[in-house]
Amino acid sequence: MTAPVLIESLDQEGRGVAHAEGKVIFIEGALPGEVVTYNAYRRKPSFELAQVGQILKPAFSRVTPECHHFGICGGCSMQHMDVRTQVAAKQRVLEDNLKHIGKVAPELVLPAVYGSPWGYRYRARLSVRYVAKKGGVLVGFHEKRSSFIADMQACRIMPPRISALIMPLRKLVESLSIRERLPQIEVSLGEDVDVLVLRILEPLTAQDETLLKAFADQHHVQLFLQTGGPQTAYPFYPEDAPELSYTLPEFDVTIPFHPTEFTQVNPMVNRILVRRALNLLDPRRGERIADLFCGLGNFTLPVARRGAQVVGYEGSAALVSRARQNSQRNGLAGSTRFMEANLFEIDESWMREQGDFDKMLIDPPREGAVAVVTALEEKQLKPWRIVYVSCNPATLARDASVLVHRNGYALKAAGVINMFPHTAHVESIALFEKARRQA
């Protein structure tokens, strides 16, 4: 057993940080202010990675995890701390990245956006494996630091009706002839239908099909089958199920989607995120606004509903087609355009060809949008306002540095969106502005 150490802070993965014998110790399951022992599982000359041992002095922010799989399952890493402490830690991660990577600081720290900490996950990719030693099939997330699948009976971060399906799914897969050739089940929930996408590597037998249909009827789900990449997923049973979609009621927008297309995992927080983004962007009638990495139109359509003319750019031809369909579905085709573009390779000449935009919204994947912000260098004073939605604080900070130090913008505000409670994932939003040309 190690000597007790004092936990000084949390790192970006939510691990407690301590110092001992000239090394930095990163301790999973430890909280700032606690005195703990630890069990190292990786030792390097300057640091160690460890699991918490005994908690000799607990922090006031420590709570009892509600899921008995916590600590083994890799789906969550922060259930041992109260939600406000989780969010405060994420806010520090955001501000530290902006300071140390971007050399910037927001003029205003926005209040954090919260949602329900339980039952929030409407999208999940569950691994499946037949394990003879376990006596059957496992369905769930991977164990921490492991390729093994956690032996899960339930999942508190998924809606109760889906959590309750884990054991029936295990029994279902075990009964199939292809139980060793079904590696993944993707969960995709809409407002009127719950979809499970089964990744299959061999054809089903007639008996398999009968078992799957009986499961779908009993548990009121629609089953898709996926034989290759995401684009190969197709409805298996029932084929006449309701359309998979989500709504943004504040903007009278309904967005249909395919179960393998990207949507936010947390629909309630997504509604709040869209509201905040539009409040910061403040679209006005007559303005021309760009929505980069627009996807299905999650932001594009609400912005258009406010009266602006919006051009959405997306790298996937399939998503561009879907976004156009969604704009027509919502009666917004006249105020929106959607264009395919590889936004990781654009430059200043491409940006000039698009014409002037009054404002811009950027919602990139984890890689960020460095090509976009670099291409804005020659745009003079337009767009004068940019709202940047980020799922990676490091790339946000890098891009913020370009916008502020090279392009003349000010970082007016930034804050976290707690899209993934109980995980270290940091979703955030930032507002950039530059002085407008005077008439």
From Swiss-Prot:
Key words, A-Z: 4Fe-4S, Iron, Iron-sulfur, Metal-binding, Methyltransferase, rRNA processing, S-adenosyl-L-methionine, Transferase
Residues bound to [4Fe-4S] cluster: 67, 73, 76, 155
Highest taxon in the source lineage: Bacteria
Known EC number: 2.1.1.190
Pfam family, one: tRNA_U5-meth_tr
Single GO term (MF): rRNA (uridine-C5-)-methyltransferase activity
Any GO BP annotation: rRNA base methylation
Record-linked InterPro entries: 23S_rRNA_MeTrfase_RlmD, MeTrfase_TrmA_AS, MeTrfase_TrmA_CS, NA-bd_OB-fold, SAM-dependent_MTases_sf, TRAM_dom, U5_MeTrfase_fam
Family: Belongs to the class I-like SAM-binding methyltransferase superfamily. RNA M5U methyltransferase family. RlmD subfamily.
Catalytic activity: uridine(1939) in 23S rRNA + S-adenosyl-L-methionine = 5-methyluridine(1939) in 23S rRNA + S-adenosyl-L-homocysteine + H(+)
Annotated protein name in UniProt: 23S rRNA (uracil(1939)-C(5))-methyltransferase RlmD
TRAM domain: residues covered: 1-54
HAMAP family noted in UniProt: 23SrRNA_methyltr_RlmD (MF_01010)
